[in-house]
A protein has these predicted regions:
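Catalytic "initiation/cleavage/transfer" segments centered on a nucleophilic residue
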Residues: 40-42, 47-173
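Alpha-helix initiation and capping sites
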Residues: 12-14, 25-29, 47, 51
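Short N-terminal edge-element motif at the start of the domain
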Residues: 1-15, 22-24
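Histidine-centered divalent-metal-coordination microenvironment in nucleic-acid enzymes
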Residues: 17-41
Length: 173
């Protein structure tokens, strides 16, 4: 799957970054939480993109995998009504949208989700991680951004992203 992210073809075209957390729940078993960050000036229709990613996952797993698309109009309205909308198109000049998007991203890395930790680690010669991320690389273009000083948002360095998406501590029993 990570190779598909890197290739940036099809539903991954204009992908800027991603976060992928592997978990093991008591009712769902093994599952993953995936957050994809696209260039919003190039891609839109988040519901459609999420469905395309789910179809790609079903293809990879030969029909054994499934996905849940939280980017439906109804689901996003529920989040918006509670002031929690952090998925879909995020506008950098909207502080609440930015904060909510960061809250969504931080959900992937919460080490306190103790009941969903990986109980059985995949076998390999070296320890396997349960969180993966793709990092946006600077492209050299300068954009003029007119944000109010009170917006509390701005350009993040790679270190800022690393600090936010720091890999969770893996607890082994």
């Amino acid at each position: 799957m990570r190779n598909l992210f890197k290739d940036k073809n099809g539903c991954f075209k204009h992908l800027l970054g991603y976060g992928l957390a592997l978990e093991q729940g008591t009712t769902k078993g093994y599952h993953a939480h995936l957050m994809l960050i696209y260039n919003g000036s190039e891609r839109c229709q988040d519901w459609y993109l999420a469905n395309e990613v789910i179809q790609k996952w079903q293809e990879i797993t030969q029909g054994l995998g499934y996905g849940v698309n939280n980017n439906t109009h109804e689901k996003k309205k529920q989040y918006a009504d509670r002031g929690l909308l952090g998925i879909g198109m995020i506008h950098r000049n909207q502080p609440l949208e930015m904060q909510n998007a960061l809250n969504v991203a931080s959900y992937l890395t919460q080490p306190e989700k103790y009941l969903q930790r990986m109980l059985i680690k995949p076998k390999a010669n070296k320890p396997k991680r349960t969180f993966f991320k793709g990092v946006y690389r600077e492209h050299g273009r300068n954009y003029k951004i007119n944000l109010p000083k009170s917006a509390g948002v701005g350009v993040w360095s790679e270190q800022d992203v690393d600090d936010l998406l720091d890999e969770p501590m893996v607890i082994e029993l």
